[in-house]
Amino acid sequence: MRRGRAAAAPAPVTGEPNGSGGSKEIRFRGVRKRPWGRFAAEIRDPWKKTRVWLGTFDSAEDAARAYDAAARALRGPKAKTNFPLPYAHHHQFNQGHNPNNDPFVDSRFYPQDNPIISQRPTSSSMSSTVESFSGPRPPPAPRQQTTASSRKYTRSPPVVPDDCHSDCDSSSSVVDHGDCEKENDNDNDNIASSSFRKPLLFDLNLPPPMDDAGADDLHCTALCL
């Protein structure tokens, strides 16, 4: 009786996904293994044409997720990644994904982008088709009223001397102070000149003396003048 050789079943190829001792190693996009056992992740910037360092991780999966997050941030949802993005995460990414909130992305390479608010000018008809990207303009500061115009002073009626009321018209609403002052000055000058006038050398009520003829001639001459 001939003995047939039993066909040996092929042994399954086993190996760890991280490549820490198996015959076959799973390789991820953008991930390299370091000699000391850690995994480094990096990605190529399509705009700057340079490699961006993402960091060193303990496992290949963490490094691959960091690469996937950076690839979606640079190239959008159609970027080639290591792991497929679930529908829920894909919907959130389309709504608005911020790479700074991702724990696997270095925020130093992705600065925060401020939203740009467009504003249309309303003054000119030709500039109505051009959008202004300078952002909302601050409201103009309210104009401060001058203190001189804001303050109101009560005007007191002018003081008019008593002599002016007799000479000026009482029915007129405007009093000319200059004319009144001139008349008052003239009256004062007349009073001063009359009060300080030198007295005569003789009294006209008394008869002239008869003893001196020369004195009579003098008095007669004075009376004629």
Curated annotation (Swiss-Prot):
Keyword Magnesium: no
SUPFAM superfamilies: DNA-binding domain
Span(s) of short sequence motif EAR-like (transcriptional repression): 202-208
Keyword vocabulary terms for this entry: DNA-binding, Ethylene signaling pathway, Nucleus, Plant defense, Repressor, Transcription, Transcription regulation
Broad class of where this protein is predominantly found: nucleus
Gene Ontology terms for molecular function: DNA binding; DNA-binding transcription factor activity
Pfam families named among the record's database cross-references: AP2
Annotated region described as Disordered, given as residue ranges: 1-29, 82-193
Any GO BP annotation: defense response
Protein localization: Nucleus
Gene3D superfamilies assigned: AP2/ERF domain
InterPro entries: AP2/ERF_dom, AP2/ERF_dom_sf, DNA-bd_dom_sf
Ranges annotated as biased composition (Basic and acidic residues): 176-185
DNA-binding region: 27-84
UniProt feature, compositional bias: Low complexity: 1-12, 118-134
One GO CC term on file: nucleus
Family affiliation: Belongs to the ethylene-response factor family. Class 2 subfamily.
Function statement: Transcription factor that binds to the GCC-box pathogenesis-related promoter element. Involved in the regulation of gene expression by stress factors and by components of stress signal transduction pathways. Probably acts as a transcriptional repressor and may regulate other AtERFs.
Domain comment as written in the entry: The AP2/ERF domain binds specifically to the 5'-GCCGCC-3' motif. The affinity of this binding is higher if the seventh amino-acid of this domain is basic. Contains a slightly degenerated ERF-associated amphiphilic repression (EAR) motif, which may be involved in the activity of transcriptional repression.
Protein name per UniProt: Ethylene-responsive transcription factor 3
Species in which this protein is naturally found: Nicotiana tabacum (Common tobacco)
